[in-house]
Amino acid sequence: MNGLGIDKVQLTFPSDAVRLRGGFNHCDGWSPKVKYMESEELGSYPVQRDYYSDVKLGTGNLTMVLENETLAPRLSTIFNPTTCFHEFALTTDMKKVRDVMQDVIYKAGIDVDILEGKCKRIDVTKDRILSEKADNYVPALASFLSFKRQSTKLEYDNGCTLGNQSKQLGFYNRYAKLEKDGLLKNAIFHENTARLEYRLLSKGKRTWTDTYNLHTFNDVVTASMDQFNGIFVDGLKNVGLRDKLKGDELDINAIRPMSLISTMQQYETAFGRNWFQTYLKHQGIVSLVEQYSLDTLVIALAEVGGGKQSKVERSRIKATLNDAIKLNTRLTQGRSSLDYIHEFYEQFKQAV
């Protein structure tokens, strides 16, 4: 399933934008665990209260943190536009998302205009069906584009991340994640579906809110699908493939030198501390065969060093050379990392 959408939104509301309805804290979803402070004037008063939507679908899986409710309430909200309507299908219909989330927040006892919320985090996301499962692309992304394998969160076992505390790209096997969550029982979903998330994080909001004109949720609601796609592609190019492009095309010369390292790493894994001697031997055999042919090399080896060899000995030499050639081919001529990176880039830069 190919798709483009906003998969996470974090908003903050200042005190003058938050109005608490009477008895709000008795609405479903508010945690009974509340943080309090003490003062001589006020006694014990709440300083932080947390909210978790009791159902996921139809509520955006909303979580909220309400601070300083007694004196000057401040509100932070996080929700997933996808789950306003569906368990996993991405959406860019932020006007409908606005209506759903405005209602959910109101039913939690808080009266705010969601359009006034200041953007703190936005995840612009694409799902693409690749030619292989997403796991197979991870080594190339990790080796050549400096993506890092993500191991601290189970949902990203089959993926990797790239970026900093301001902007990140997260790539993972979407099919594996949904299957793990039990969401594919009654759904048709291609097993090669991969997800790439462009995460605009809170520490970089002073920069990206200006760059992409996403200051408030109203800016998100009024943005078009083309704008979201432009933001996503900008992240793909400038975070994921920075210094690896010439214009809109991959710069082969910026990636190709890494192919030699990848090949040598394959030999090191296969042969341990003797990998380099084996690598040189195999490369030499392949080079001689390409220059003279296998039969000519067998004849030459049979004639040198011990006189003429029997047909049996020649067959043994030929078999040994063939084994070396086949192993070299397997270790060096599988699908290249460059090919994986090229498909990754071409697929995710496409408009949906």
Each language-model region and where it sits:
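Helix-turn-helix DNA-binding segment
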Residues: Q309-A319
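Residue-level detection of the helix-turn-helix DNA-binding "recognition helix"
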Residues: A319-K326
